[in-house]
């Protein structure tokens, strides 16, 4: 393989032409490289939560939660495969991860609008979703918005991924923040003075902000820690568990 990758064999793993035992592979994932262990943990967490909603009631709110979890699975799963170097390569999985990441806030608003029965702004969600899909497809073709990260090998045998922001990245971030502020304003107007409801829905906003913040930290020069995934593991779990309690009420 042209890039650092992992090819699964019957008796072990081949990594840059060297066979590794399964024990070494697990050591690489969980003990030596947070860049692999954290996204795999986030993937398992999202998968578990999705299973929890399989036998729940079917309405717009629950469908929104399932869509959020599905987007989380696409994001975390694609990031895991990208960081493992699985075929067809970094760029391919990077674009799938970007799709999952950007669809999380879209589906968050599907849940939020469904729970608060905000129906007069459904067109906003559809437009937002279509624009997001078009943006990801455009980035996959040109790489001008958020290029695939650079793989950097370190002296201790581990590796990190370094993201390089562009002008398009700044425009994307500004758009996401603008939509988040507008959606929060609509929710605020709908909730009014209902303090209990506001407390229950606050984790949704917190989760979206932390996921966005974690990805922004990864864009800082010299940043080599996987803030993107670490910022989402606990927050997304808390968000969905609280949302499940909200729906149960």
Language-model-detected regions and their locations in the chain:
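Methionine residue identity
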Residues: 1-4
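Short, strongly hydrophobic alpha-helical membrane anchors
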Residues: 6-9, 13-30
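Juxtamembrane membrane-water interface segments that cap and precede transmembrane helices
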Residues: 21-28, 152-167
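Individual alpha-helical transmembrane segments in multi-pass integral membrane proteins
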Residues: 29-46, 57-144, 165-178, 227-236
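Interfacial "cap-and-anchor" motif at the non-cytosolic start of specific transmembrane alpha-helices
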Residues: 32, 78, 197-248
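Alpha-helical transmembrane segments in multipass membrane proteins, preferentially the mid-helix core
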Residues: 48-52, 108-111, 173-193, 241-242
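Juxtamembrane membrane-water interface segments of multi-pass membrane proteins
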Residues: 54-55, 115-122, 186-201
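Membrane-interfacial helix-loop-helix modules of multi-pass inner-membrane proteins that assemble, modify
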Residues: 141-157
